[in-house]
């Protein structure tokens, strides 16, 4: 795929990534000028998960934008968030392979952003799983932090029609004729497996954070991912925490600490 010719706003803010078949909504947070160190800054792409509820205008966007602003302010990094196809103001329809392609575009965009010297990725739930996959496939990614990430998506593929119906209900499949090929759509759910790719990331940095009481993705998934990376990970299990860790102050503190420990 040819990288899109996109220049995010110099001072940060919302912008669009226009591609041949879709437009992706994105947001860039920059630290205050006083936080700059050296000639370049580290960059982080933050990925959201699969929505649990029908969309409320810009609600999820605001939450991730606020997280990006905080991370940039606290760490001095340039932080980019992306709305995957079918979510928020991004066009298109959900497919797992499509979301992974969107993340790869975001990595390209951030790497080409003036002032960014290297890129890490971070994600929550499905976004964390895709962040692992992207890091496993792209050696330019310097490290990954994944929160509540599933080890694979095989359970979704077992009843693809039901999952399509769920995706329609939460608004990430908008075209009534999509997917044209249900089996090909479901095949991506079986073949895109963080469990198969996380072992390609070390010695690059990996942070896995999971809630001990996660009611959606078992904490066993985090332990399986850690084992698949030959235990070359920082694994943190948060007592009493459930699935949604984006607003858990302990999870955010772990992310900020991990970012601060990344080398030049």
Q: For the regions a protein language model found, what residue spans apply to each?
A:
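Glycine-rich "HGGG/HGxG" loop immediately N-terminal to the catalytic nucleophile
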Residues: 82-96
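Primarily recognizes the serine-hydrolase "nucleophile elbow" in alpha/beta-hydrolase
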Residues: 105-165
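Alpha/beta-hydrolase active-site loop signature
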Residues: 51, 84-88, 151, 242
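Short, surface-exposed "cap/lid" segments of acyl-processing enzymes
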Residues: 32-74
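Alpha/beta-hydrolase active-site loop
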Residues: 63, 93-114
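The alpha/beta-hydrolase serine catalytic core
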Residues: 3, 10-14, 24, 138-237, ...
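N-terminal cap/lid segment of alpha/beta-hydrolase-fold proteins
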Residues: 1-39
